[in-house]
């Protein structure tokens, strides 16, 4: 069994629109499902229920990018996987150190949120999605005690003065901003902090410490599985708001070189 955080989009029931419409109140669902696979990512889905299977399939595909010896995220392997996905393309990548300083954790969280916004490579207007991103980043650096034994966190070098760990998140998003596509963003953090582990487990966003943070991430977009789409979408994906020429993601996805389906 493992847990998924699902942000469920509620759909316009009279189908006057073919794209997902978010209605208030917004529903955040934590779902625990049986699984024969070990999830190495903290998985956060923001999508319509009929696309959960596609998101799970993509998540499981990127499990192959986890090095079985170190349990770290193999960035080159992830690129190879992304380039082999059918009807998919890459909109952003990152593989570098992003923090090397003494910093208040709340400030670091805000900086990393903007880094994720950039590596996503798409304009996502949903406040709820970005609140989920902010919560996930916050849990990468704080609230660690309840997560201490989770598969997405790997404790490495521990000493009286330092702690190093890996933390892996995977976001899946599908809404009116992504149109006929789903975007998947696996992220791996390599974190070293000048704090002993037992203290780190209870660190808060108002605390400061010296951090070294490296991020490995890439964003893959894939065409939605047509058999899960409303009939109107199967025959006319241009009904999605994304295909309005003034939508900020229109040219990004329109000009994307999608991987071909191998025959």
Swiss-Prot record:
Keywords: Sporulation, Toxin, Virulence. It holds the Pfam family Bac_thur_toxin. Signal peptide: none annotated. GO terms for cellular component: extracellular region. GO terms for molecular function: toxin activity. InterPro entries: CytB_endotoxin-like_sf (IPR035918), Endotoxin_CytB (IPR001615). One of its GO terms (biological process) is sporulation resulting in formation of a cellular spore. Active after proteolytic processing. Belongs to the cyt1/cyt2 endotoxin family. Kills the larvae of dipteran insects by making pores in the epithelial cell membrane of the insect midgut. This is Type-2Bb cytolytic delta-endotoxin. It comes from Bacillus thuringiensis subsp. jegathesan.
